[in-house]
Amino acid sequence: MKKLLDMAEQLSERYLISEVMELPEQAEDQVYYQLLKMAGKSMLEQIGEVERERLEYKEYIEQWIHEIKTPITAMKLLCENHRTDWTKELLLELEKTNRFTEQALYYARSEHTEKDYSVREMALSQVVHQAIADNKYLLLQSGMRLEVEEMQGTVYSDEKWVRFILNQLIANAVKYRTEQPVLRISTHKRQDQVVLVVEDNGIGIAASDLPRIFEKGFTGQNGRLIQQSTGIGLYLCKRLCEKLGIGITAESSEHGTAISLSFHINCLIHEVQS
């Protein structure tokens, strides 16, 4: 019995204990063994069914998001071709809607990201300006002043994912802005890394909240004051950065917040593949 308990302790899925047990010699013990086998089989079947349902739901969500992006893009083009004060407001709301659908898509994919990324050489300057273009109406409406320094060199990563991460950081800078808001984006080299810094002069993050900002659903003191805060954006940024081997850190004070993304120059591909 002790041997059996020890074996069970070593299993991460203890319902599989019957798979590693030896067939008992005594008839009475064999009955219990068969019952364990039946219970284990039933559990595996139920787990398989739940996994299939989860996968079907995930595929449905991804398909729905792709479908909804088509009318969003069409409405955006119509508004851009017929500029009025009303369509300017609508463009801002469409930009927000597109950002939320992107967030839902990446959340759905975040569990199995290895099937979706494509690591290749990319220019940081290009992806930064793409992210700014993605949020141009939000930035204009907020009165945000942009200060974008010359981006240093190229790195190896997934351009689409990095663009999504930057979109989240830009949206946060707008959400937690103060009067006369400023957003600075810069790079610098540090040993074998290129560090991309997104910095704002917003309301900042409380020191007690800073260690938890990448936790799922965590909004913090300032987040609770803003109804739009969900605690998902930075959580997704952290999760995607981990998958891509990008370091992500945050510094904050009452004068603003700086998020740093650290790209390894030489070993990023190895880290992602491992």
Explain the meaning of each model-derived region.
Residues 180-192:
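Short beta-strand/loop element within the Bergerat-fold HATPase_c
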Residues 173-174:
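Short helix-loop "hinge" at the ATP-lid/N-box region of the Bergerat-fold HATPase_c
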Residues 200:
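Acidic ATP/Mg2+-coordinating residue in the GHKL
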Residues 113-117, 150, 154-157:
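Conserved micro-motifs of the catalytic ATP-binding
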Residues 136-148:
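Short conserved segments within the C-terminal catalytic ATPase subdomain
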Residues 205-218:
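Short conserved segment of the HATPase_c
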